Regions:
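Conserved catalytic-core segment of NTP-binding enzymes
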Residues: 1-76
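Short beta->alpha linker loops
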Residues: 14, 82-85, 104
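Residue-level signature of catalytic and energy-coupling elements of molecular machines
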Residues: 22, 81, 109
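Active-site phosphate-binding and catalytic loops of NTP-dependent enzymes
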Residues: 34, 123-124
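Beta-strand-loop-alpha "switch" segments that mediate conformational coupling across diverse proteins
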Residues: 68-96
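C-terminal boundary of histidine-terminating zinc-finger modules
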Residues: 91-108
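Extended, charge-rich low-complexity interaction segments
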Residues: 104-123
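A short, charged, Gly/Pro-tolerant segment at domain boundaries
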Residues: 125-140
């Protein structure tokens, strides 16, 4: 399937082993496709980062979006899917998570699809939510 592709969405997690695997796939996409063999250029690549947690990235407990997209893989980010309980629930129920429209993961997949189809959408659920005034007051 990869050989005949015109575009590819590389899916990775914000952890080193997953990003390394994605880097190997990108190398294959850049060297082993029909387009490359026929000197028609490279296929268009997009990045989807799953299981992202902005709080953990902010604390440097996981790679950031820029670490992955700009510094390591150098592939534009199409979507970022936050870590969300609805992913496990959807899997257990045999339903696509995109149908969970009230959940952050469902909304983020919907945004990703819209961007892939050419629509401009802001990136949601990728920054640390500001603490409320009570949490700031009591240091929680």
């Amino acid at each position: 399937a990869m050989y005949h592709a015109d575009e590819a969405i590389i899916v990775t997690n914000p952890e080193i082993s997953s990003v390394r695997d994605s880097d190997r796939i990108i190398g294959m996409l850049d060297s082993k496709t029909k387009k490359v063999e026929q000197n028609e250029g490279r296929i268009r690549k997009h990045l989807c980062i799953t299981r992202f947690n902005p709080e953990r990235a902010d604390k440097q407990e996981m790679l950031t979006i820029d670490d992955i997209s700009k510094d390591i893989l150098r592939v534009p980010t199409l979507g970022v899917i936050p870590e969300c309980k609805s992913v496990l629930q959807a899997s257990n129920e045999g339903k696509p998570v995109i149908l969970f429209t009230e959940e952050t993961a469902g909304q983020s997949y919907d945004d990703l699809v819209a961007r892939f189809l050419g629509e401009e959408r802001p990136y949601r659920h990728i920054t640390v939510k500001p603490k409320g005034w009570l949490a700031r007051l009591f240091g929680a």
